[in-house]
């Protein structure tokens, strides 16, 4: 990757989250909702840009008020939106999200089909994708055609151009026809990624085993990988590289809303990796990068909403120094 740019290109969905004005209620009980920009790949792109890195987003939005608003949010946050296209015949996706009293998030999606699902491979900004040092994606874009084929083609283009491929499945069971199809399609591209990040919930979903022990995690390891990460919420993160493995504790903060914390973690880690790709082979450097990512995720959880909560590098370093 010597001589390549430090650009992180995110591929996938960007949508509007509608979040209740009060916490701890079901969607049916919510008295009112506020709108917030969302979508994990877009959050990652903005996280990278907020930290001073080069970031771009590739995806499709509805040619509507919400779609134009989301594209403007990307630009306002320093993300290159040259990979964004608009669909005049489909709406921007909506999601109603609530944090129930038991702490679990509840989702209800409006996508039948939404614009993000209708991206075709002919609409890909190939030149932008070829400039990526890291090409990052989730699994929601694998659910339906034509977006699935566009996703697979974009991965090929990025890989052929020398990019690292980064995969965060970002499981949303409610969007898949069945658990079986979700598992099969999420794993269908597993072998292509250089960097994979899963949560402990996703680890259990993909392995069928409720454990974060090394032997369980290693069921998801592939010889083609450079780094496999399991995030454990406020317990930090476990990491597995080709020649070493370990765990990095998180930072203790007062959590308000964990939405976007995982995306902040991914964005921060990718930012550090493109700054110094040798950290994938150097345990000390990698642990420093993960500490930085943990701090970024922790700060994001202290405020409401994903994008407004994403920190700057100064804020992250301040937390790391005070810990």
Swiss-Prot record:
- List cellular component terms (GO): cytosol
**Catalytic reaction equation(s):** D-fructose + ATP = D-fructose 6-phosphate + ADP + H(+)
Tissue expr: Expressed in roots, endosperms and leaves.
Highest taxon listed in the record's lineage: Eukaryota
What GO biological process, any one, is recorded here?
starch biosynthetic process
ATP-binding as a keyword of this entry, yes or no, is yes
Q: In which pathway does it act?
A: Glycan biosynthesis; starch biosynthesis
Q: Which UniProt keywords apply?
A: ATP-binding, Carbohydrate metabolism, Kinase, Nucleotide-binding, Transferase
Question: Can you name this protein?
Answer: Fructokinase-1
- What is the scientific name of the source organism? Oryza sativa subsp. indica (Rice)
Recorded name of the encoding gene: FRK1
């Amino acid at each position: 990757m010597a001589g390549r740019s430090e650009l992180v290109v995110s591929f996938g969905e960007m949508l509007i989250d509608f979040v209740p004005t009060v916490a701890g209620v079901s969607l049916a009980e919510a008295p009112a909702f506020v709108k917030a920009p969302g979508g994990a790949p877009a959050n990652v792109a903005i996280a990278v840009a907020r930290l001073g890195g080069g970031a771009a987003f590739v995806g499709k939005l509805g040619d509507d008020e919400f779609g134009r608003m989301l594209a403007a949010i990307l630009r306002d946050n320093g993300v290159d939106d040259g990979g964004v296209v608009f669909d005049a015949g489909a709406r921007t996706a909506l999601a109603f999200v609530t944090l129930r009293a038991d702490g679990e998030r509840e989702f209800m999606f409006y996508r039948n089909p939404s614009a993000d699902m209708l991206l075709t491979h002919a609409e890909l900004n190939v030149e932008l994708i070829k400039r990526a040092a890291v090409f990052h994606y989730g699994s929601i874009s694998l659910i339906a055609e034509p977006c699935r084929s566009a996703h697979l083609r974009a991965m090929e283009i990025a890989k052929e151009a020398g990019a690292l491929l980064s995969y965060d499945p970002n499981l949303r069971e409610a969007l898949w026809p069945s658990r079986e199809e979700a598992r099969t399609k999420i794993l269908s591209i597993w072998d292509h990624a250089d960097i994979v990040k899963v949560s402990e919930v996703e680890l259990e979903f993909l392995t069928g085993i409720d454990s974060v022990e090394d032997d369980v995690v290693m069921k998801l390891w592939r010889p083609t990988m450079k780094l496999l990460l399991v995030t454990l919420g406020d317990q930090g993160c476990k990491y597995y590289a080709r020649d070493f493995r370990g765990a990095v504790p998180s930072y203790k903060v007062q959590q308000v809303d964990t939405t976007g914390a995982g995306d902040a973690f991914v964005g921060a880690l990718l930012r550090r990796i493109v700054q110094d790709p040798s950290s994938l082979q150097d345990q000390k450097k990698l642990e420093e990068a993960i500490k930085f990512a943990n701090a970024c995720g922790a700060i994001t959880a202290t405020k409401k909403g994903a994008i407004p909560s994403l920190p700057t590098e100064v804020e992250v370093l301040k937390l790391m120094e005070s810990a």
